[in-house]
Amino acid sequence: LQQVDQLDGAHVWIGGRRMVMFSSYSYLGLLKHPKVQERAREALDRFGTGTHGVRILAGTTAAHVQCEQRIASFLGTEDAIAYSSGYVANLSTISTLLGRHDVVMTDKLSHASIIDGCLLSNAEFQRFKHNDLDDLKRLLEAAADKFEGKLVIVDAVYSMDGDVCPLPELVALCHEYGAWL
């Protein structure tokens, strides 16, 4: 494993060299932001170094609830939920939204968390060629009257190669076939 000697926003120091970190969660540099560090110290003093269990049993703190309320207020929604990682967010959200009467279609290069969420959902699981709108259209046409719900899932930016999805075209295609995106 590569040892990181120092974090600096989207950069790291490894072996005395400053490098761009393409796999960082802190691509906006917020891990070193003074306000974020101040609030983290406050949480450390109040709650210690971690929760006392998983959130569903005994791990939800006042900080979790306040964060979710602020997110919901910012978005103008009834509620929000914060997850500990993107992987868990994808896994639980996808598997909750879909069931055995639905179909989910995802790009062949989708992140593993998307694939796992799709498999856990019990929905019909289909994959289309990478960023290939014609292949997706073929799947959507075939699914037109066969399923209660249709969900198309893509990465906005594919983490393994940096490709960007054709979002405006995907929105139009999903709208045309009555699929969620």
Give names to the regions the model predicted.
Residues L1-T49, A179:
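N-terminal "arm"/small-domain region of PLP-dependent enzymes with the aminotransferase-like
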Residues G29-L30, L57-T60, A112, L133-D134, ...:
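Short, small-residue-enriched loops and turns at beta-alpha junctions
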Residues E38, E42-S85:
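Conserved N-terminal alpha-helix of the aminotransferase class I/II PLP-enzyme fold
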Residues T93-A112:
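Conserved PLP-anchoring active-site segment centered on the Schiff-base-forming lysine
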Residues R100, L120-N122, Y177:
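Short, structured coil segments at secondary-structure junctions
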Residues Q126, H130-L181:
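Active-site phosphate-binding strand-loop segment of PLP-dependent enzymes
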